[in-house]
Amino acid sequence: MRDELNKGLIDFLKASPTPFHATATLVQHFEAAGFQRLDERDTWAIETGGRYYVTRNDSSIVAIRMGRQSPLTGGIRMVGAHTDSPCLRVKPQPELQRQGFWQLGVEVYGGALLAPWFDRDLSLAGRVTFRRDGKVESQLIDFKLPIAVIPNLAIHLNRTANEGWTINPQNELPPILAQVAGDERADFRALLTDQLAREHGLNADVVLDYELSFYDTQSAAVVGLNGDFLAGARLDNLLSCFAGMQALLNTESDETALLVCTDHEEVGSSSACGADGAMLEQIVQRLLPSSEDYVRTIQKSLLISADNAHGIHPNYADKHDANHGPKLNAGPVIKVNSNQRYATNSETAGFFRHLCMAEEVPVQSFVVRSDMGCGSTIGPITASHLGIRTVDIGLPTFAMHSIRELAGSHDLAHLVKVLGAFYASHELP
């Protein structure tokens, strides 16, 4: 099971270089399992035992498995994750021609570790909006090939590079695509028009706009002398999206279950398709049209917010509280923060610990050092919007927000197992 899941995750990561592609890949899996698309602009006819999914902005998805028992009776089991990761996004007017090179201006999306982006084989993917035959259309594209690079400055020209180096994103991050002749003018939109034709056979009249991100073309892989680790881009948080999908598709229950994978978590979630927007609340309200039933059901429900946790790094162990250093391959981590940066409380943590014990899955705890700030997740946001009880958990990870992150190769199976038990559980606290 472990090897099969790891291979599945590697394939999922390769197919999902952007939130748009991640959502499209999730859609493919759910449709293959018989889930039906619901359009938010249409009237819904929800059936007992039905399987559905809803997307918004092509970058967020909610998958729904209606139980044979009314959600008013047993509540709803929700798992939440996010589809976005820190990256470099192409600017609207990106063309730069300097010293005979064609470069693209980029904007840093989220809290990225910038140094690892240098000297990598980069490709480009995302969504393009264009006009064709007088109509506005959108399509996903992925160049797949390594078409760009951000070369480092040689140490001979930067003798203090290893003593600490502040990266200027405006000046130092524009990737190089090609060399150009002196009077040749690079045209990025023409490049996108050609890619639409090559990839989809579409003859666009004009490219109107785009949301495109650079990504590392190196595939994810199981690494380490004994294959102990899983290395790859976007583990935060496509690992949790994949685990939630596997758990939902491979469990049967009389209870209603949701997988919620939203965009824009890395930049605060405040968007129409983010956790701080109304998407999830509106969907659940349509499943439970009565306001009385909605409130009663939410109070019987529970959300597991799944997002990667900081594993204790052997070279930087002092960055963790000595009693709360999650180890790779030692199971999922319950995240706790007294200031509500995580939504976990004793009741929800106890229930998750109970699930892990019942499934013989190891479980750990994380609390940030008292002299350090704490990050947050979609957990507190969703808990406050819906009023739903929530536990924040995640798999321990090194190099979070780097271009290539590292997790334990045994932990994915642990997470899928306990999320499956949650979806199948007959009783919630």
From Swiss-Prot:
Zn(2+) binds at H82, H156, H401. CDD domains: M18_DAP. The keyword Metal-binding applies. Keywords: Aminopeptidase, Hydrolase, Metal-binding, Metalloprotease, Protease, Zinc. GO terms for molecular function: aminopeptidase activity; metallopeptidase activity; zinc ion binding. Its EC number is 3.4.11.-. This is Probable M18 family aminopeptidase 2. It comes from Pseudomonas syringae pv. tomato (strain ATCC BAA-871 / DC3000).
